[in-house]
């Protein structure tokens, strides 16, 4: 009798324990459902805001940030449209899979009435297995064809006779721009003309590296393209409006990779012609700053830098012939002002830690004279 009571008591406890676990399971499933719903809402909200931001981007305003949502050239627009196409397909896949997952979790969750009953066993479905094989294959084929089409259109574009040719050389940690047909060499700030669709004047870039791997990337004007030692890569862009576009090195290249910035100034035809004319002007001797020129020619400056009309013919650092025509120094790390220029000469690491430019051990009078001289190089 006592044994039967003990067994009955154990059976009651087990039933109570099982009911408790089922309730806990139901609560857990509700939490999962709520969490999944919240996550889906957050993702949808983020995507909506991202697309709304892209749609609301003001195309006529000067660019101030690197922006992948406001393409301003044919290659960039092709890449953007492909990205949105892939995003739409993957978004649909995400919604379908998430919906089915949530439905299955909610519909077939464990209930108190299911206790002790084995769920229905399914041993395969030819239709479902064909569907989840054929549909993914078709999706991959569509994505492959769309991507191949864009790659072909960008990489195999013909070069018209009106195209501007620029050689881009990546250095640690600055950019060199050479215009072979114009006889111009500058640094960090690329000037190119706007391309009128009626009379296209695209810019074709030949990309080289002087030391290690770099990557040229101006998001609004084109995809990133690597600069690799002993290899020539090419890319092109045809900006549709004038303005300032920011870019940067997109391949880790050393300590100051993050500050290897670049600026692309897209000029109207007349403005670009004026810039070319000013860059072709030789430097002139100015008696008021002859002392600064002497400092440049008698110190280590000439080992790295070139200034037309002086003994300086170095190529390790940027060409300074028209230094003051640039808005920034140190590859965009600082504005090109008197104060920043003095600091850059005295202690480059204060502006760009890890820079390969050494601190010039100059007296204050020599720094003053050198800065006054450099400020005449326009």
Protein language model regions, located:
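Alpha-helical transmembrane segments
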Residues: 94-110
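Short, solvent-exposed mixed-charge patches
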Residues: 377-378
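Non-transmembrane, membrane-proximal soluble domains of secreted or membrane proteins
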Residues: 57-85, 105-315, 330-346, 351-353, ...
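Hydrophobic single transmembrane helices highlighted by the model
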Residues: 78-98
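Hydrophobic alpha-helical membrane-insertion segments
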Residues: 41-52, 94, 135-141, 145
């Amino acid at each position: 009798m006592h044994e039967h009571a003990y067994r009955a008591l154990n059976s009651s406890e087990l039933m109570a324990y099982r009911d408790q676990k089922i309730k806990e399971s139901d609560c857990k499933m509700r939490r999962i459902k709520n969490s999944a719903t919240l996550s889906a809402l957050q993702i949808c909200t983020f995507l909506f805001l991202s697309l709304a931001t892209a749609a609301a981007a003001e195309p006529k305003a000067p660019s101030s940030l690197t922006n992948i949502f406001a393409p301003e050239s044919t290659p960039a627009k092709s890449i953007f449209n492909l990205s949105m196409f892939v995003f739409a397909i993957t978004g649909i896949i995400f919604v379908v899979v998430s919906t089915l997952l949530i439905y299955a979790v909610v519909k077939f969750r464990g209930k108190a009435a299911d206790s002790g009953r084995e769920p229905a066993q399914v041993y395969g479905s030819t239709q479902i297995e064909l569907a989840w094989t054929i549909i993914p294959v078709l999706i991959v084929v569509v994505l492959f064809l769309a991507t191949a089409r864009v790659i072909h259109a960008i990489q195999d574009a013909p070069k018209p006779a009106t195209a501007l040719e620029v050689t881009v050389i990546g250095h640690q940690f600055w950019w060199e721009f050479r215009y072979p047909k114009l006889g111009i060499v500058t640094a960090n700030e690329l000037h190119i003309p706007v391309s009128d669709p009626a009379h296209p004047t695209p810019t074709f870039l030949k990309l080289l590296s002087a030391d290690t791997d770099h990557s040229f990337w101006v998001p609004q004007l084109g995809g990133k393209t690597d600069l690799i030692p002993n290899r020539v890569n090419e890319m092109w862009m045809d900006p549709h409006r004038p303005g300032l576009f920011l870019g940067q090195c997109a391949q880790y290249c050393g300590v100051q990779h993050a500050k290897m910035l670049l600026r692309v100034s897209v000029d109207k035809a007349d403005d670009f012609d004026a810039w070319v004319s000013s860059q072709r002007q030789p430097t002139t001797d100015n008696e008021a700053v002859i002392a600064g020129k002497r400092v440049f020619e008698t110190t280590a400056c000439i080992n790295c830098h070139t200034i037309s009309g002086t003994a300086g013919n170095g190529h390790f650092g940027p060409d300074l012939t028209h230094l003051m025509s640039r808005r920034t120094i140190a590859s965009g790390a600082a504005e090109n002002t008197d104060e920043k220029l003095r600091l850059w000469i005295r202690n480059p690491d204060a502006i760009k830690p890890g820079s390969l430019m050494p601190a010039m051990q100059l007296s204050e009078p020599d720094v003053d004279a050198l800065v006054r001289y450099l400020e005449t190089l326009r």
